[in-house]
């Protein structure tokens, strides 16, 4: 009798499974994803074959979303967060929770293969960006220091692949204005140049009761030139130079009421500000050999910024902080890597 009780549930499960298989008429749609190639200075491979988590955003998507800086990527790039602390000076980037608000960054930033070592240079105006890649996870093996959280690669449009003139004008409330102009020209098949510039303005959102003026107004402008030359079939040379100037008002900070835990009004007497001058120049050389390539990146970056902040956040003159910084950074990197489609690849560099 006990054996009979064990056999009946077995057959019931078999019949139920068979009926489920017969009644399942679901058709699953299979979609072949488009090929995405990592264009990094360190590597060039199909993103689908890479053992890492990455996101790639095209220039069209950037324009459609009206993205003007890295901070705005936080809304749709997984595991990427760049908080806004009130000025471009404090611009930490966090990937998977790894980042640094002070000292050296934990996420690396490269623009056309040129490294940006200082966090205060991360928050710059996007203009004519062709593509952005976010590589999540430690990248120290290929990129070295300050890449524990990941890497952000920004690529601008190439004058050898794109020609024309673009004009962008936008206006909004609170005095928000954005004007941009760019021109791309190819001379023959071997030389091309690109010139672009933009201006952004914001009258601010918070009023300082002491001065009766906006506390967080902002004006910024940038200019950029890019030259590309292919003197031979296997040799490519490039020169990039950019200049960025930002002038921001102070921080819309207010004293918090410890009893009600509510913020008070912005009301302080000393004028607060952040002013930054950023200049970056880079030279690139790439040679494609038979099964290998030799690549070089030379860069120089100059940063000069000035910060003043009323840190008592009150109408009284108690504590005012001033910070000035000037940095000159030079970098040189050369690598040689395999370009074959074999199972194994190699790379050497310094």
Regions found by a protein language model. Name each.
Residues 70-73, 92-97, 110, 134, ...:
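N-terminal periplasmic accessory domains that precede
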Residues 21-61:
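Short, acidic, small-residue-rich periplasmic hinge/interaction motif at the N-terminus
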Residues 50-69, 94-97, 171, 229:
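Short, polar/charged loop or turn motifs at beta-strand boundaries
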Residues 71-114, 130:
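Extracytoplasmic beta-strand/coil segments of soluble accessory domains associated
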Residues 164, 171-202, 210-248, 277-281, ...:
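Transmembrane beta-barrel wall of Gram-negative outer-membrane proteins
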Residues 112-138:
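Short acidic/polar hinge/loop motifs at secondary-structure boundaries
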Residues 236-279, 305-309, 317, 321-325:
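Flexible loop and strand-edge segments within Gram-negative outer membrane beta-barrel domains
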């Amino acid at each position: 009798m006990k054996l009979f009780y064990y056999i009946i549930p077995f057959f019931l499960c078999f019949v139920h499974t068979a009926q489920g298989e017969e009644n399942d008429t679901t058709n699953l749609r299979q979609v072949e994803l488009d090929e995405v190639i990592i264009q990094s200075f360190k590597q060039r491979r199909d993103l689908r074959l890479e053992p890492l988590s990455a996101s790639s955003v095209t220039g069209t998507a950037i324009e459609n979303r009206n993205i003007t800086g890295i901070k705005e990527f936080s809304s749709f790039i997984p595991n990427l967060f760049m908080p806004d602390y009130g000025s471009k000076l404090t611009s930490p980037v966090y990937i998977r929770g790894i980042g640094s608000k002070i000292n050296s960054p934990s996420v690396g930033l490269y623009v056309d293969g040129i490294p940006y070592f200082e966090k205060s240079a991360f928050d710059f105006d996007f203009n004519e960006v062709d593509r952005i890649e976010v590589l999540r996870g430690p990248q120290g093996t290929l990129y070295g220091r300050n890449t524990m959280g990941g890497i952000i690669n920004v690529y601008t449009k190439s004058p050898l692949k794109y020609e024309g003139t673009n004009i962008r004008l936008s206006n909004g409330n609170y005095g928000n204005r954005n004007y941009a102009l760019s021109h791309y020209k190819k001379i023959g098949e071997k030389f091309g140049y690109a010139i672009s510039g933009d201006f952004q303005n914001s009258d601010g959102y918070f009023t300082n009761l002491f001065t009766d003026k906006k506390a967080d107004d902002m004006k910024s402008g940038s200019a950029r030139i890019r030259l590309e030359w292919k003197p031979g079939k296997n040799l490519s040379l490039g020169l990039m130079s950019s200049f960025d100037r930002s002038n921001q008002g102070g921080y819309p900070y207010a004293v918090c009421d410890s009893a009600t835990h509510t913020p008070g009004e912005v009301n302080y007497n000393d004028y607060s500000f952040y002013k930054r001058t950023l200049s970056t120049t880079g030279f690139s050389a790439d040679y494609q050999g038979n099964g290998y390539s030799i690549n070089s990146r030379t860069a120089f970056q100059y940063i000069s910024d000035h910060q003043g902040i009323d840190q008592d956040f009150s109408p009284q003159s108690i504590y005012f902080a001033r910070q000035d910084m000037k940095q000159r950074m030079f970098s040189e990197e050369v690598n040689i890597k395999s370009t074959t489609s074999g199972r194994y690849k190699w790379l050497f560099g310094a």
